């Protein structure tokens, strides 16, 4: 988590989160903490919220009859948690998410597992149309408590340059 304290007047500080475009270095890896232990309530809630009622995610008896032997955590929840875990390191200052590609679910995630995530900066370039911003691309990997990769994706975001973020402009 990137957290800074900015002095806004003598003896008074305001916290600031996230990275400016210039602070991203290709090859750097950010380990996102804390991890998140998945509960049955998390899984049921997300399946119902998104109207994904496949029994593999909500019916223990059905899950017992599958090759997995139990219910699985619904995949979009895994991805959503990984995105959320990465916000403070990758996209807290983002102007716009430009998209996700190469989303892969590589190993089952089960209720009771703890999900961890990390993001590697794989590319960055200045925006051709927005001189105060740049495009940063990261590969985010989710792992369970045993270090087994469960999911990955590539994400690109439009990031402001130093001093050009919304909070810089409005004294936030």
What annotation goes with each model-predicted range?
Residues 2-99, 151, 161-172:
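Hot-dog-fold acyl-thioester-processing enzymes
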Residues 38, 109, 125, 146, ...:
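Residues that cap or initiate secondary-structure elements
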Residues 133, 137-143, 148-165:
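Flexible glycine-rich active-site/ligand-binding loops centered on an Asp-His dyad
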Residues 19, 36, 104, 124-125, ...:
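Basic side chains
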Residues 97-99, 122-131, 155-164:
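Short flexible/disordered coil segments
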């Amino acid at each position: 988590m990137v957290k800074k304290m900015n002095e806004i007047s003598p003896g008074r500080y305001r916290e600031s989160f996230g990275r400016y475009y210039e602070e991203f270095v290709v090859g750097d890896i950010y380990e996102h903490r804390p991890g998140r232990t998945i509960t049955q309530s998390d899984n049921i809630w997300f399946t119902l919220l998104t109207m994904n009622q496949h029994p593999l995610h909500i019916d223990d008896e059905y899950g017992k009859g599958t090759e997995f032997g139990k219910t699985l955590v619904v995949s979009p929840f895994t991805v959503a948690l990984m995105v959320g875990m990465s916000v403070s390191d990758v996209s807290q200052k983002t102007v716009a998410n430009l998209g996700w590609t190469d989303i892969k679910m590589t190993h089952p995630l089960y209720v009771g597992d703890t999900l961890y995530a990390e993001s590697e900066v794989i590319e960055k370039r200045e925006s051709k149309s927005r001189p105060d911003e740049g495009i940063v691309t990261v590969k985010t990997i989710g792992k369970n408590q045993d270090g087994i990769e469960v999911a990955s994706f590539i994400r690109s975001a439009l990031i402001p340059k130093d001093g050009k973020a919304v909070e810089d402009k409005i004294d936030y």
